[in-house]
From Swiss-Prot:
Binds 2 magnesium ions per subunit. They probably participate in the reaction catalyzed by the enzyme. May bind an additional third magnesium ion after substrate binding. Phosphorylated. Phosphorylation upon DNA damage induces relocalization to the nuclear plasma. The gene is FEN1-A. Gene3D superfamilies: 5' to 3' exonuclease, C-terminal subdomain (1.10.150.20), 5'-nuclease (3.40.50.1010). SMART domains: 53EXOc, HhH2, XPGI, XPGN. Mg(2+) 1 binds at residues 34, 87, 159, 161. Its cofactor is Mg(2+). One of its GO terms (biological process) is DNA replication, removal of RNA primer. This is Flap endonuclease 1-A. Pfam families: XPG_I, XPG_N. DNA binds at residues 71, 159, 232, 234.
Length: 394
């Protein structure tokens, strides 16, 4: 779910905090990518026709493999250095949200049956997408694929967004890429949206700078966390009647959730019971993550050609010629990515360059500040096209 209404709130109140960037501006940069979010996007869009998805001969869905394979090659071709971070065990406080998602999928499944009976194709596609769930098998398939591609994989002990933010704060990566805005709530210094969007949509990457977000909103980090909780997050329901703008006004006026609650008009606003905002705050400020010093050095290695062919062609029915051509593209892309950014030739380490609060001049000049909420929209799709296709419609 992320943080309700946060994208528009930032666009309306902290214009300088968001810049439009070209995909290629991140050449040589290490980017932590929320793997589960990417897989979800691929399952929603890749190879989909109504309620049908790409499958192998055993009837197992392969859309996630095709999407991950093709998009990762595209990322590497642009010279980026992706690090995919996978979710671990969710916090207990998230169980209520997960239960709600399960119920929504169940409702969507019933609506899907009705849509199929009435022959309404638009509703069939709509409700089919709402039934999508990223499974353990989907995650395992993609972990295996990425390792065969020679791309680093991180397994978070809990929330992937928190692990990504920790890597970013520790300067292990330059930025975090996801579509969930709670990456900012966890403290990511740089946050990217639309990085995994298909090239065909021609959407710029949106780069959020947390320091400028705080400056624009007039809050410190503790107050920003409280704002996100008040807006509505995975750990706490919203308070009916309090939208993002009202939440910002209240936090600016009172400074903390405790004082907001003390001064809240109880006749007008009903606080959910329970409303565990203190535990939610703790999870955002002190999440369960791998200590940065224990994270191994990231390495991008040569792809395992035979392993990829076995997984994609033999096990999942991908076209052999397309896969082999894609692997050649992957090898070329790996060589390009290994060149690194220009500063590396002058002895500047990646961690040193990350300490700058703003992007290099070449990137800043290419970036374009986002000034309207309309320019900041959530991603809706993953790539439909790529160098390798496999499977058949389910």
């Amino acid at each position: 779910m992320g943080i309700k209404g946060l994208t528009k709130l930032i666009a309306d109140n902290a214009h300088g905090a968001v810049k439009e960037q070209k995909f290629e501006n991140y050449f040589g940069r290490k980017i932590a990518i929320d793997a589960s979010m990417s897989i979800y996007q691929f399952l929603i869009v890749v190879g989909r026709s109504g309620s049908e998805l790409l499958t192998n001969d055993a009837g197992e869905v392969t859309s996630h493999l095709q999407g991950m394979f093709n998009r990762t090659i595209r990322v590497l071709e642009a010279g980026l250095k992706p690090v995919y971070v996978f979710d671990g065990q969710p916090p207990d406080l998230k169980k209520r949200e997960l239960a709600k998602r399960f119920a929504r999928r169940e409702d969507a499944a019933e609506d899907l049956v009705t849509a199929k009976e009435t022959g309404n194709e638009a509703d069939v596609e709509k409700y089919s997408k709402k039934t999508v769930k990223v499974t353990k098998q989907h995650n395992e398939d993609c972990r295996k694929l990425l390792r065969l591609m020679g791309v680093p994989v991180v397994e978070a002990p809990s929330e992937a967004e928190a692990e990504c933010a920790s890597l970013c704060k520790a300067e292990k990566v330059f930025a975090v890429a996801s579509e969930d805005m709670d990456s900012l709530t966890y403290g990511s210094t740089r946050f990217l949206r639309h990085l995994m969007e298909p090239t065909s949509r021609k959407l710029p990457v949106l780069e959020f700078d947390i320091a400028k977000v705080l400056e624009g909103l007039g809050l410190n980090m503790d107050q920003f966390v409280d704002l996100c909780i008040l807006c509505g997050c995975d750990y706490c329901d919203t308070i009916r009647g309090i939208g993002p703008q009202t939440a910002l006004k209240m936090i600016r006026q009172h400074g903390s959730l405790e004082i907001v609650l003390e001064n809240l008009n109880k006749d007008r606003y009903q606080v959910p019971d329970p409303w565990p905002y203190q535990e939610a705050r703790r999870l955002f400020k002190e999440p369960l993550v791998t200590p940065p010093e224990k994270v191994p050095e990231f390495k991008w290695t040569a792809p395992d050609t035979e392993g990829l062919r076995q997984l994609l062609v033999e096990e999942n029915g991908f076209n052999n010629d397309r896969v082999m051509k894609a692997i050649e593209k992957l090898k070329v892309a790996k060589n390009k990515a290994s060149q690194g950014r220009l500063e590396s030739f002058f002895g500047v380490s990646s961690s040193s360059s990350n300490k700058r609060k703003e992007a290099p001049d070449s990137e800043a000049s290419a970036g374009k500040q986002v000034k309207t909420a309309a320019a900041v929209k959530p991603a809706k799709a993953a790539s439909k096209k790529g160098p390798a296709k496999g499977g058949k419609k389910k």
